[in-house]
Design a protein with these regions (language model features):
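Charged docking surfaces used in two-component/phosphorelay signaling
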Residues: 16-24
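Active-site beta3 strand of CheY-like receiver
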Residues: 45-51
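C-terminal output helix
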Residues: 87, 105-115
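Short hydrophobic/Thr-rich beta-strand motif most characteristic of the beta2 strand and flanking loop
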Residues: 26-33, 41
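Acidic catalytic/metal-coordinating carboxylates
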Residues: 34-37, 60-63
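Alpha4 helix (beta4-alpha4-beta5 surface) of REC/receiver domains from two-component response regulators
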Residues: 63, 84-99
């Protein structure tokens, strides 16, 4: 099965950019416009990594991650946010986020984190 990444982002232009870059890197890319849509999609289509924004309509990234962890999901979650305060970062990690990036960031850093996750996943 191909490595699958879900992008959870309410800004369509940002979703398109992530999709373009990740697809060109060889990943299967799923998309959702907010946490609620992501949970609905994940109910039928699993993924390996979720890249999620924090603040979105209906359900934000932190609430989505809390719900996933309550469902015993072990999916790897990378949160990206423009609200990069130490308290926000702690809040995200307590909710179950695996990695945290503050916008703006270099896409190469995000791609490297995804690559490292898949490299470690391959190790028996």
């Amino acid at each position: 099965m191909s490595p699958t990444v879900m992008i959870v982002e309410d800004d369509p232009a940002t979703r398109r950019l992530y999709r373009f870059l990740l697809t060109n890197s060889g990943y299967v890319v799923l998309e959702a416009e907010d946490g609620m849509a992501a949970l609905e999609r994940l109910a039928t289509t699993p993924c390996d990594v979720i890249i999620t924004d924090m603040n979105m309509p209906r359900m934000g990234g932190i609430e989505m991650v809390r719900t996933l962890r309550q469902q015993q999901s072990t999916v790897h979650v990378i949160m990206v946010t423009a609200f990069g305060t130490p308290d926000t970062e702690k809040h995200a990690y307590r909710a179950g986020v695996n990695e945290y990036l503050t916008k703006p960031f270099d896409f190469e850093e995000l791609e490297q984190r995804v690559q490292i996750f898949f490299a470690h996943k391959q190790i028996p």
